[in-house]
Curated annotation (Swiss-Prot):
EC number, as in UniProt: 6.3.2.6
EC category: ligase
Matching NCBIfam families: purC (TIGR00081)
Annotated Pfam families: SAICAR_synt (PF01259)
Gene responsible for this protein: purC
PROSITE patterns membership: SAICAR_SYNTHETASE_1, SAICAR_SYNTHETASE_2
Highest rank taxon of the organism: Bacteria
UniProt keyword annotations, A-Z: ATP-binding, Ligase, Nucleotide-binding, Purine biosynthesis
Catalysed reactions, as listed in the record: 5-amino-1-(5-phospho-D-ribosyl)imidazole-4-carboxylate + L-aspartate + ATP = (2S)-2-[5-amino-1-(5-phospho-beta-D-ribosyl)imidazole-4-carboxamido]succinate + ADP + phosphate + 2 H(+)
Protein name as it appears in the record: Phosphoribosylaminoimidazole-succinocarboxamide synthase
Entry-linked InterPro entries: SAICAR_synt/ADE2_N, SAICAR_synt_PurC, SAICAR_synth, SAICAR_synthetase, SAICAR_synthetase_CS
């Protein structure tokens, strides 16, 4: 598998086309960002850690019958994925009140929600990822409206799987975000990554924030 050209470089990853047109290589960067990429800091080993965690989670989800774009881990900082038609929508699942949820609704940080809450955001650094509903998604053509209920269903299933894994390690899964796309086969799948960059994790006994993020 050979890299052909750089397709895109984002805050945390570089995406490369390969000599197989339906496959891409994701290279994770040793860079931490905040405030929509305004603040940046190089952290040695971050890329390999995110690649390792994301690869492991994708493999676990695939074992549970959840489709992802993941094919295999190639190296410390690289993974091979299926090329997908990505939807510019972030799907956030919340188990506890934190981040923008606290600012929007005035709920005390750390409050356990009665049930997992799924929210949708338009993926746009320029617009600071505005919150959207299914009607926005339909009118703005962010994703096929008929797929939104399935995205929510998958997100809740992922939540149950990850919550159990983290709780066994003494970690609370406060919230996390997913991105979705359509594979060459036409199947709906989770794309991008699932790593500490896309989660908020707290120590179960102390409430300490394990991962500092400006997301969701």
């Amino acid at each position: 598998m050979k890299k052909v050209r750089k397709l895109y470089e984002g805050k945390a990853k570089i995406v490369y086309e390969t000599d197989e047109k339906d496959k891409l290589i994701l290279e994770f960067k040793d860079v931490a960002t905040a405030f929509d990429g305004v603040k940046k800091e190089e952290i040695k080993g971050k890329g390999s850690l995110n690649n390792e965690i994301s690869s492991l989670i994708f493999e676990i989800l695939e074992d549970h019958g959840i489709k992802t774009h993941y094919i295999k881990k190639l190296s410390d900082r690289e993974m091979l994925v299926w090329r997908a038609e990505r939807f510019p929508v972030e799907v956030v699942v919340r188990n506890y009140a934190a981040g923008s949820f606290v600012k929007r609704y005035g709920v005390k940080e750390g409050t356990k929600l009665e049930q997992p809450l799924v929210e949708f955001f338009m993926k746009s650094d320029e617009l600071h990822d505005p919150m959207v509903c299914i009607n926005h998604i339909k009118v703005l053509k962010l994703a096929p409206a008929e797929l939104v209920p399935e995205m929510e269903k998958i997100a809740l299933k992922v939540n149950e799987i990850l919550k159990k894994i983290f709780e066994e390690k003494g970690i609370l899964l406060v919230d996390f975000k997913l991105e979705f796309g359509r594979l060459p086969s036409g199947e709906l799948a989770i794309v991008d990554e699932i790593s500490p960059d896309s989660m908020r994790l707290w120590d179960k006994s102390t409430g300490e924030n394990w991962i500092k993020t400006d997301s969701v």
